[in-house]
């Protein structure tokens, strides 16, 4: 294997900090502190500005005290918490036949992660999920971790500014997130805390309507391109820019080994679509897919540490004819595979028929289920059609079954939806799926943006995030065109962080408003470096500014290259404010 080359170190003007727990003092919750410079007053005196603390997904890679070693993996911060609960055990070996086969294949030695765990954990009594604990009234360390993380130390600055209330549209956003609130939201099924007991490296996070809107980044190799090194680098790159979870959608060579490297080096939850690997195991022949191979794949991936599975269980055989009226048919890869299988075998899919057994497997490892939208609309013409809604209603039925087994559940959504149909989509989901968190791909609000689909989808993502979606799956500018590269991942993640942030502002999250408030203050005071550092992409902000005003002195200037020295409105504001203040004093 080639040597890994990942980007490390803090973003400009930032430093990693850790906040300790109260209920569980051993917790060290990571955050990013953006250092603010002083305001220079008219009389030349300095006024201190509060530093801004923001949510941080980058893991130890931005901690200057951490020595990165991808061959060792990131720290297993949850291992002792899991051990202390006493409800799991170490298996004697891998339960998956395929996992054992890969482990014993000497030809894979050079590709294999060196420290593979050959004795994964499983629940002693069949269930070790955060949903089960929450329903028992238990507050776990993961729940307090999440509460601290969501608050971002906002209490330290809350009295210094006037927060906008926002319009939460039915969401319930408390002034302060408590561990008990986290527990209650999970218990009600309105939020999930994806945390496979075999992924102790993951830093707990939460996905739910009443929390900050999260984003997911898709990575993964294809039969045509990419390597293990490239996919690990993409994963680390995505979390550096703010991906809350990462889905490995690999369909090329060495899927098992690629996933192991990603999980062991990931501080965020990892999701997959197990059906993809199952299809690879039968050499792409849909007709040969069966429950036994799929079941083995679920166990294989659960024992590696995958935190959530996209499973297309809601696509029923009788739904398939509804797609014949569509302009673009079935565009979901998983959906098209299931539809093909159902049509060939003239029966319900093995996934639907064995759904309860799937839930029992997932409960053993605390793998959350993301109920896939195999019938999502692939164009504006097909939005909110009969096929999409029929599947969505089935997903609601499956949600109740998953909850019966204490399996954490989220619902996947579209797709391509014009702006005037987005709110209706959200309302149907909330009712049909009993308030379970919604996880949407965009939606794209137009079909004509090839090369710019990260923008057309972010428009829809910001709206549906405001209306109630809990997590947004990013879309890159390569959507519909090709496999995204490293820079496409960055562009997609930052674009979706913006969409999520816009939704948080609209819903009235105080932490979102504080960052905007401080950015506006820095902008009016011509504190250029603070503006750069508060940006979602500080490096690009610096690059754009310095392209026309590169000298260090220009970072103190009271103008930029857009308006120049004589046409800067903020500079003019300062001048007439000074005059008005002087007149007021003289009177």
From Swiss-Prot:
GO terms for molecular function: 4 iron, 4 sulfur cluster binding; carbon-carbon lyase activity; zinc ion binding. InterPro entries: ThiC, ThiC-associated_dom, ThiC/Bza_core_dom, ThiC/BzaA/B. It is an enzyme of class 4 (lyase). Pathway: Cofactor biosynthesis; thiamine diphosphate biosynthesis. One of its GO terms (cellular component) is cytosol. One of its GO terms (biological process) is thiamine diphosphate biosynthetic process. Gene3D superfamilies: 6.10.250.620, Radical SAM ThiC family, central domain. Substrate binds at residues 218, 247, 276, 312, 332-334, 373-376, 412, 439. The keyword Lyase applies. Keywords: 4Fe-4S, Iron, Iron-sulfur, Lyase, Metal-binding, S-adenosyl-L-methionine, Thiamine biosynthesis, Zinc. Zn(2+) binds at residues 416, 480. Belongs to the ThiC family. Catalyzes the synthesis of the hydroxymethylpyrimidine phosphate (HMP-P) moiety of thiamine from aminoimidazole ribotide (AIR) in a radical S-adenosyl-L-methionine (SAM)-dependent reaction. This is Phosphomethylpyrimidine synthase. It comes from Porphyromonas gingivalis (strain ATCC 33277 / DSM 20709 / CIP 103683 / JCM 12257 / NCTC 11834 / 2561). The gene is thiC.
